[in-house]
């Protein structure tokens, strides 16, 4: 192999390594920020569920349309959260695999947040009723909540679910499906709490208060899912870029050995030519 070509390849891969290393560091910083935001949303969401739990003794499901479905048409709405960009390992593939294996497209419609999910669902023939991929993810909470709530209340869907990558740690995430409507209390169960559930004095009336608290809870669940998904995305990208950086270093090492070998062979051949020429001159 040509020595000049080898040098160009080594230089090119070294530049790629610098880029992947920088992307790895940037993703690590973004992941820590998103992780902190995800942690900070949990206490408020938990507090809302405590209020609902302690008020349930005075509230019947009939008090709020958010607590029960108006239809039994077996039609479901899925809010799918993916990423707009690639280079994040199997982050998006995990979402695609889950949808492909777990979701019946005939009885399902989708609200998507993320271009990758929008492209995949369109390719497999899923029906997308709203796509919020072009706006800032944090600004998409309110329109997603409004659209899904409106469709649920008019009886278009029996249930509404969230599908997203739940952030577990810096090296691990899991694709999960969470029920959004009808609302369920997932963080706190009555049998798990040792607190005495006192009756609240609810004013002006249980229906008005519970409706507003439930709406806040649903909106916070959407916001929490988006933040967790972003943390998982940055985590996956950080790991992908780390692997790319390590692979680039290994390739550079192997190419450097090959370059040294080629250069040594070239020097050896030149010496042989010189010796052969000297012997030829002396024999003549």
Predicted ranges, named:
Residues 1-284:
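C-terminal beta-strand-loop-alpha-helix "lid" module of Rossmann-like NAD(P)-dependent dehydrogenases
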């Amino acid at each position: 192999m040509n020595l000049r070509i080898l040098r160009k390849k080594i230089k090119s891969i070294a530049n790629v390594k610098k880029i992947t290393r920088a992307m790895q560091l940037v993703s690590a910083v973004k992941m820590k920020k998103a992780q902190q935001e995800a942690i900070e949303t949990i206490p408020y969401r938990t507090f809302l569920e405590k209020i609902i739990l302690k008020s349930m003794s005075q509230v019947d499901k009939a008090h709020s349309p958010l607590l029960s479905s108006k239809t039994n048409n077996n039609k479901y709405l899925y809010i799918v959260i993916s990423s707009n960009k690639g280079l994040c390992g199997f982050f998006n593939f995990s979402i695609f695999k889950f949808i492909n294996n777990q979701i019946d497209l005939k009885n399902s419609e989708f609200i998507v947040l993320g271009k990758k999910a929008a492209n995949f669902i369109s390719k497999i023939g899923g029906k997308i009723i709203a796509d919020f991929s072009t706006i800032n993810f944090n600004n998409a909470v309110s329109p997603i909540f409004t659209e899904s709530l409106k469709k649920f209340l008019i009886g278009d869907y029996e249930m509404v679910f969230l599908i997203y990558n739940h952030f577990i740690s810096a090296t691990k995430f899991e694709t999960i499906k969470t029920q959004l409507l009808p609302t369920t209390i997932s963080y706190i169960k009555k049998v798990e709490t040792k607190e005495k559930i006192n009756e609240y004095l609810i004013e002006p009336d249980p229906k008005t208060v519970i409706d507003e608290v439930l709406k806040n809870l649903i909106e916070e669940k959407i916001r929490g899912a988006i933040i967790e998904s972003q943390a998982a995305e940055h985590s996956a990208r950080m790991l992908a870029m780390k692997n790319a950086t390590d692979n680039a270093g290994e390739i550079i090492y192997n190419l450097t050995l090959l370059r040294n070998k080629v250069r040594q062979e070239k020097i050896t051949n030149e010496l042989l030519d010189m010796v052969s020429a000297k012997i030829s001159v002396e024999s003549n």
